[in-house]
Amino acid sequence: MNIEDLVWKHALANAVRYGGKADVKAVMAKLMADAPELRQRAREVKQLVEEVVAKVNAMSPEEQLRILRERWPDALEEKKAEQKRPGIEGLPELPGVKDGVVVRFAPNPDFVLHLGSARPAILNYAYRLKYGGRFILRFEDTDPRTKKPLVTEEVNAYNAIREDLRWLGIRWDEEYIQSQRMEVYYDHARRLLEMGAAYVDLCKADEWRRLRNQGKACPHRDQPSEAQLELWDKMLEGRFGEGEAVVRIKTDLAHPDPSVRDWVAFRIIDTTKTPHPLTGDKYIVWPTYNFAVSIDDHLMGVTHVLRAQEHSVNTVKQSYVFKHFGWEQPVTIHFGRLKIEGATLSKSKLKSMKIRYDDLTLPTLAGLRNRGILPEAIWDLILSVGIKPSDSTVALANLYALNRKHVEPIANRYMFVADPVKLVFEADRELVAKVPYHPSFRERGERVYRLGPGRVELYVQRRDAAAGKVIRLMELANVEVQKIEGDVAYGRLHSLTLEEAKKAGAPIVQWVWDPVEVTVIKPIALGKKAEERGLGERHLEKVEVGAYVQFFRYGYLKKKGPLEFVYLHD
């Protein structure tokens, strides 16, 4: 299939899946995943994608579907193809699966996604692929005070999360935003108050805490439903201020965990002071996490919940809402924390740093993407950890090793010399070097260098140019370094073949002729980068921005700008 047909296929498939509007970034991500060799031509391909997406989005949904069915019916069977993703079939079976699963990924948009939050997203989606069913994206944004959704000129967390998920190859079947569902929560709160399963508490916080710790009911708990509904209406009307009234779910006042005892379902937040970025000051009575989650999991038909062990108490709290309504609670699987050695996954710490959320030194998905980590490597890491209940600690080196596996086939090889010295020697004949772009993919071609006869000048690393040492100039010749004067090394042509180099114990070194200045950016810590400058071969000018390369004896890199590269790993 030619490139244009491939772009049309993915643009139409993306539009059909998402209500008639294709997304350029999503189509690019799918293209690069399916045809990694196109990464070397990213700029050219993106221009084509933009043109095709504009044409696709101008069509009616019916026309989009018709063309897709006629030309690429296989795209409508995406689920079957996705199920072939390596590692999915090896996941442990989930209990209680009937006709597929309904799972959800429910981020709080108070920050962007990081490596840790990729775990529930990938695991839930992986099980949706394994069994079939539905994957729900639900933004849990009902705390505009302490976990205010992040919407600024620099970043809109809602959109950033969507972009991160698309980059991971995750495609949701339904999307909900809890702050847009307030009337649903109000309706269910009223029903619970009418049933006598909830009540409006007017106690002071310290008085409630004392009663709770003693396992005693507050004086408002057993008031008739009529009185409760009257207080509820006053809450909605703004007759109470922050902290003056809350709605509590009736649980077990003797429960061994005091936090479970009659937990708060609704509280008052003065949105004239802390407006919600989507709803402003329209609402002042806000559902807590546990209440909104309970209602939504039932109404959305969630069958299985996969989430971190830290939510185990929340599962207990939510069970009371399900019992009061007579609903079946989803099967819940708790997995341990994922700790990454060498990376900070704390939202609060990452948010406090005065650097962009997509800075390539951060373990945010946007930061990892900018650095050059591929989504396939993150999938491999998360699936290797799985859903075990114990905490898991992995080193960033593990992620780099997995990334190397995916980058190696697509990274063409180039020569780069850090800390260069000029090497000068005389050649009694023409020396020819044929350097393939990739040793395993000879069809990508090679560049040919012809040097000599006569004086030859090229550049090698200072550490390779020790006096009295024979070195093998990769694919070119063997030279004995005779002396070094400042930044110039002088040598003599020793021999020509690799076999002769081996006999002389000569190391193979990279070299550069007719060089260009190259800058390498090296992430060294959160918010900290180092720059290394050196000389590279002129062919690096033709490498597309965003393409992956390997510098011989140096490591893998991603091109960031004109002759500027980001170091990934060795």
Curated annotation (Swiss-Prot):
Keyword set includes ATP-binding: yes
Keywords for the protein's UniProt record, in alphabetical order: Aminoacyl-tRNA synthetase, ATP-binding, Cytoplasm, Ligase, Nucleotide-binding, Protein biosynthesis
Any one Pfam family match given in the protein's UniProt record, by short name: tRNA-synt_1c
GO MF terms held by the record: ATP binding; glutamate-tRNA ligase activity
Motif ('HIGH' region): 107-117
Catalytic activity field: tRNA(Glu) + L-glutamate + ATP = L-glutamyl-tRNA(Glu) + AMP + diphosphate
Domain of life: Archaea
Any GO BP annotation: glutamyl-tRNA aminoacylation
Single GO cellular component term: cytosol
Gene3D superfamilies in UniProt: 2.40.240.100, HUPs (3.40.50.620), leucyl-tRNA synthetase (1.10.10.720), Ribosomal Protein L25, Chain P (2.40.240.10)
Function: Catalyzes the attachment of glutamate to tRNA(Glu) in a two-step reaction: glutamate is first activated by ATP to form Glu-AMP and then transferred to the acceptor end of tRNA(Glu).
NCBIfam families: gltX_arch, PRK04156.1
Protein name: Glutamate--tRNA ligase
Organism: Pyrobaculum arsenaticum (strain DSM 13514 / JCM 11321 / PZ6)
Gene: gltX
